[in-house]
């Protein structure tokens, strides 16, 4: 009897479950604000309507405020959901509002975009 196939299947399942067990959440609260897995501050944009499923920040706006991108297989978790952008890519949303990074933030914990033009805010 060939024992390779069951062994290979067992190994594959073990690796899959190990990966799931160590998966990090897409974002978490740290220092009183929402940050991504790298510790970079996440922001919301006042022109985005909560629950609309759309981002109003595209083109040049998205160059300065990069969307917090979600993987194709990303699943909602808690207050985090996923919206589909105009270009078909997926973006994380917090309480229904798309979330973004700020290009001028250079290291984890930076929050230099808070209240930028009175329309960008850190997520608290």
What residue spans do the PLM features occupy?
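Bacterial N-terminal signal peptides that target proteins for export
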Residues: 1-9
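Compact beta-sheet-dominated domain cores in extracellular/mature segments
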Residues: 2, 20-124
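Bacterial N-terminal signal peptides
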Residues: 10-18
């Amino acid at each position: 009897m060939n024992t390779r196939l069951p062994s290979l299947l067992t190994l594959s399942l073990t690796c899959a479950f190990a990966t799931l067990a160590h998966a990090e959440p897409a974002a978490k609260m740290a220092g009183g604000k929402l940050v991504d897995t790298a510790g970079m501050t996440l922001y919301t944009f006042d022109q985005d309507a909560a629950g609309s499923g759309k981002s109003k920040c595209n083109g040049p706006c998205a160059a300065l405020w990069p969307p917090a991108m979600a993987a194709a297989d990303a699943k909602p978790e808690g207050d985090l959901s996923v919206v589909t952008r105009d270009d078909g890519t997926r973006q994380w949303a917090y309480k229904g509002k798309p979330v973004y990074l700020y290009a001028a933030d250079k290291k984890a914990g930076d929050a230099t975009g808070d209240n930028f033009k009175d329309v960008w805010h850190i997520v608290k």
